[in-house]
Amino acid sequence: MKSIVFVALFGLALLAVVCSASEGAHKELLKEVVRAMVVDKTDAVQAEERECRWYLGGCSQDGDCCKHLQRHSNYEWCIWDGTFSK
């Protein structure tokens, strides 16, 4: 009877160790995924930084504005030039 109780307690202890190790591995995997998402987000933001200015972005000439934008005649910002494209 004592040996059965000992085996049961040993089994529960072993199960607790395995579960905690699995939980630690899961947390590490989650951290890696979050880091990858943050790095991807940072890279995406850097990729969006372009040499041209977006709508209502400050500019000094038409060449500073992105496609289909032009410099406003009175203000130094980019506005839509009235053209369309596919």
Swiss-Prot record:
Disulfide topology: 52-66, 65-78
InterPro entries according to UniProt: Huwentoxin-1 (IPR011696)
Tissue and organ distribution: Expressed by the venom gland.
GO molecular function, one term: toxin activity
Residues of the signal peptide: 1-21
Coiled-coil features, chain-numbered ranges: none
Pfam families: Toxin_12 (PF07740)
A Gene Ontology term for the protein's cellular component: extracellular region
Residue numbers covered by the propeptide annotation in the UniProt entry: 22-50
Function: Ion channel inhibitor.
Free-text comment about domains: The presence of a 'disulfide through disulfide knot' structurally defines this protein as a knottin.
Protein name per UniProt: Omega-theraphotoxin-Hhn1e
Organism this protein belongs to: Cyriopagopus hainanus (Chinese bird spider)
